[in-house]
Regions:
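Short alpha-helical segments that sit at the start of domains
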Residues: 2-29
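Glycine-centered, phosphate/nucleic-acid-interacting loop/turn motifs that mediate DNA/RNA or nucleotide
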Residues: 67, 73
Length: 113
């Protein structure tokens, strides 16, 4: 069975600005790119992207606040841990001369709130 991707055009101006901010931030894009297919911890994200860990934590907080990440956690011998997975599969922008259009494709079965 094939899951077809649904592309959503963002109409809310505040939400559109958030996506434009995410798309223009190299660290947000690096983080999202690293967790599209496989969930990772903040430390794993920092290692795979070479983004400083403090920057990873700040951007993860921003992405969580804006509902772009699925977060789950658990306990292991070292204590609590959280893993992050992008709710975005892809995003695109288009300028038609008078308006900017932002479209997003959710990752798997995640919905963008």
């Amino acid at each position: 069975m094939q899951i077809s991707a649904l592309t959503i055009t963002i109409k809310d101006e505040a939400r559109k600005q958030i996506y434009l901010q995410i798309l223009s931030d190299q660290f947000c894009m690096g983080i999202i790119s690293s967790i599209i297919d496989d969930p990772k911890t903040a430390v794993e994200i920092a290692k795979t992207t070479s983004i400083p860990i403090s920057t990873v934590y700040r951007r993860l907080q921003f992405l969580q606040e804006n509902k772009v990440l699925k977060t789950s956690g658990g306990l292991n011998k070292d204590g609590k841990y959280f893993v992050y997975l992008s709710k975005l599969k892809s995003a695109s922008t288009h300028f038609d001369g008078s308006e900017i259009w932002v479209s997003v494709t959710p990752n798997l079965n995640f919905t963008i709130n």
